């Protein structure tokens, strides 16, 4: 039996559907009254751990899970050593730079040197501005980063944007996209090397059904 890390939240339903098409059914994890954090597939070939999206690469990297599904945004920010297996295509959103709508900033280079930029993704934000050679101070927030510009603590934010509705409701606009993030299938490197074809067969099944 091998172990899969499934992300709680927005990616969970599609993640379960992905494995179900490959013959591993963890539908019990979607039951509203179920408080369990571990689930066996109906076929008893695998078990799933229900974890926070940001913890998926941690469990996979440290070997507590052999496979996992995680957003590319989290995977890129974590920089943990995992095998990057498949782009699953769902959960799409942009990592974006946004500012107040009534500001004079139309592009990244309009931001003043050494201004503050709020983000949950501090490594991603720092790398982005270093590549542009724009000196900024990254302010790490774990909640609603939109409050950074609203309160005057920051001139801009770097955050995930799906529909743009939250930005609009808070008087913010995008001025650049860093990258497009989708759900990714990842694996533990050692598990992949020691695999007796159970992981390989699952990955191939996911790949074949994901293309249809």
Swiss-Prot record:
Alphabetical list of PROSITE patterns matching this protein: ATP_P_PHORIBOSYLTR
Keyword line: Amino-acid biosynthesis, ATP-binding, Cytoplasm, Glycosyltransferase, Histidine biosynthesis, Nucleotide-binding, Transferase
Record pathway: Amino-acid biosynthesis; L-histidine biosynthesis; L-histidine from 5-phospho-alpha-D-ribose 1-diphosphate: step 1/9
One GO BP: L-histidine biosynthetic process
Catalysed reactions, as listed in the record: 1-(5-phospho-beta-D-ribosyl)-ATP + diphosphate = 5-phospho-alpha-D-ribose 1-diphosphate + ATP
UniProt entry tagged with the keyword Oxidoreductase: no
Enzyme class: transferase
EC number: 2.4.2.17
Subcellular location: Cytoplasm
Subunit composition and interactions: Heteromultimer composed of HisG and HisZ subunits.
Role description: Catalyzes the condensation of ATP and 5-phosphoribose 1-diphosphate to form N'-(5'-phosphoribosyl)-ATP (PR-ATP). Has a crucial role in the pathway because the rate of histidine biosynthesis seems to be controlled primarily by regulation of HisG enzymatic activity.
Domain remark in the UniProt entry: Lacks the C-terminal regulatory region which is replaced by HisZ.
NCBIfam families the record matches: hisG (TIGR00070)
Family: Belongs to the ATP phosphoribosyltransferase family. Short subfamily.
Record protein name field: ATP phosphoribosyltransferase
Organism (species): Prochlorococcus marinus (strain MIT 9301)
Lineage, opening ranks: Bacteria, Bacillati, Cyanobacteriota, Cyanophyceae, Synechococcales
């Amino acid at each position: 039996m091998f172990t899969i890390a499934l992300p709680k939240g927005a990616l969970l339903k599609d993640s379960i559907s992905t494995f179900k098409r490959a013959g591993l059914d963890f539908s019990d994890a979607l039951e509203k009254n179920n408080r369990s954090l571990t689930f066996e597939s109906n076929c008893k070939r695998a078990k799933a751990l229900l974890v926070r999206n940001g913890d998926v690469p941690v469990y996979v990297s440290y070997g507590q899970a052999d496979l996992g599904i995680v957003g590319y945004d989290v995977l890129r920010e974590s920089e943990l050593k995992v095998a990057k297996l498949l782009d699953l295509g769902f959960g799409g959103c942009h990592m974006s730079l946004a500012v107040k709508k009534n500001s004079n900033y139309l592009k990244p280079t309009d931001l003043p040197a050494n201004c503050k930029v709020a983000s949950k993704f501090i490594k991603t934000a720092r790398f982005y501005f270093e590549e542009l050679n724009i000196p900024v101070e990254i302010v790490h927030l774990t909640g609603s980063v939109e409050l950074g510009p609203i309160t005057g603590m920051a001139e801009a934010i770097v955050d995930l944007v799906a529909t743009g509705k939250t930005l609009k409701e808070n008087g913010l606009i995008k001025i650049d996209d860093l990258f497009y993030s989708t759900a990714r299938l990842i694996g533990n490197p050692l598990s992949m090397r020691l695999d007796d074809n159970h992981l390989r067969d699952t990955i191939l099944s996911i790949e074949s059904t994901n293309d249809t």
